[in-house]
Swiss-Prot record:
The active site is at 70 (proton donor/acceptor), 182 (proton donor/acceptor). GO terms for molecular function: glutamate racemase activity. Keywords: Cell shape, Cell wall biogenesis/degradation, Isomerase, Peptidoglycan synthesis. GO terms for biological process: cell wall organization; peptidoglycan biosynthetic process; regulation of cell shape. It comes from Campylobacter concisus (strain 13826). Provides the (R)-glutamate required for cell wall biosynthesis. Belongs to the aspartate/glutamate racemases family. The gene is murI. This is Glutamate racemase.
């Protein structure tokens, strides 16, 4: 089966990496909207247009299902995409429910880091209210992380200083989970792990998203790991340049290392 994965940029490679670990016999189309990244500070109308352009492109190129591997696009566009397109559309959702289910100490909180659009959006707030977790959840927008990720600036002093400056706003000893509410943030798990107290676990929504994809399409987890069959597109143009393909390969290799950090 041909499956499309769409993100504003290269953050969604973390979702592709998760998909390849479980569904290696399937074909994937990965669409990175690099001309318009980042989405986190764009208007709602802009994000809707970009999302429809991307998903329609993937469907036109044979995708039988599409994963919107972008929390910001999911927050803004998922309802409209599902209402107007006939293929299954799987969205991202910050792993707040997972953190809520795993937490065994009512005195400790969950910190969700995401883009400004996701943090201020109704979808995340509705999720928190439905879980009755408003008093146990704090939100923090980290817009610069997306730009760092797109530049492949993962471990610089600029990144570490930025994270420390933002996270110092919270008494981290009062938290037990940090939820990555943006797929770009998976690149920074090592830097986050250095800053966070040992008792704070890092979780993301990638595994849950691919589980939903498998369930909705009735797929089976691959019994063997085959060579990935993936075509990459930058805002509708197939990526053929060797240097760009090598960059994507390096990013996937880094994300595979980051999967082990929690």
């Amino acid at each position: 089966m041909r499956i499309g994965i769409f993100d504003s940029g290269l953050g969604g490679l973390s979702v592709l990496n998760e998909a390849l670990s479980k569904l290696s016999e399937h074909e994937f189309l990965y669409y990175a909207d690099v001309k318009n990244v980042p989405y986190g500070q764009k208007s709602r109308d802009e994000i809707l247009k970009f999302s429809f352009d991307a998903v329609k492109f993937l469907v036109k190129n044979g995708a039988k299902a599409v994963v919107v591997a972008c929390n910001t696009a999911t927050s803004v566009a998922i309802k409209e995409l599902r209402a107007n397109l006939s293929v299954p559309i799987i969205g991202m959702e910050p792993a707040v429910k997972k953190a809520h289910d795993l937490s065994h100490d009512d005195a400790l909180k969950t910190l969700v880091i995401a883009t400004p659009v996701t943090v201020n959006g109704a979808k995340l707030k509705e999720l928190i209210i439905n879980l009755n977790a408003k008093d146990k959840t704090e939100l923090l927008a980290l817009p610069r992380l997306v730009n760092f990720a797109e530049k492949a600036e993962f471990e610089s002093e600029n990144v570490k200083s930025y994270l420390k400056e933002e996270l110092v706003k919270f008494d981290l000893s009062k938290f037990d989970f940090l939820v990555l509410g943006c797929t770009h943030f998976n690149y920074f798990k090592d830097s986050l792990r250095e800053i966070l107290p040992p008792n704070v676990s890092i979780i993301d929504g990638n595994e849950g998203t691919i589980k939903r994809l498998i369930s909705e399409l009735g797929l089976k987890i691959s019994s063997v790991n085959l060579t990935p069959n993936v075509k990459f597109f930058y805002s509708g143009e197939e990526v053929c340049e060797q240097n760009e393909l090598e960059k994507i390969s390096r990013n996937l290799a880094r994300l595979e290392k980051m999967r082990a950090i929690c």
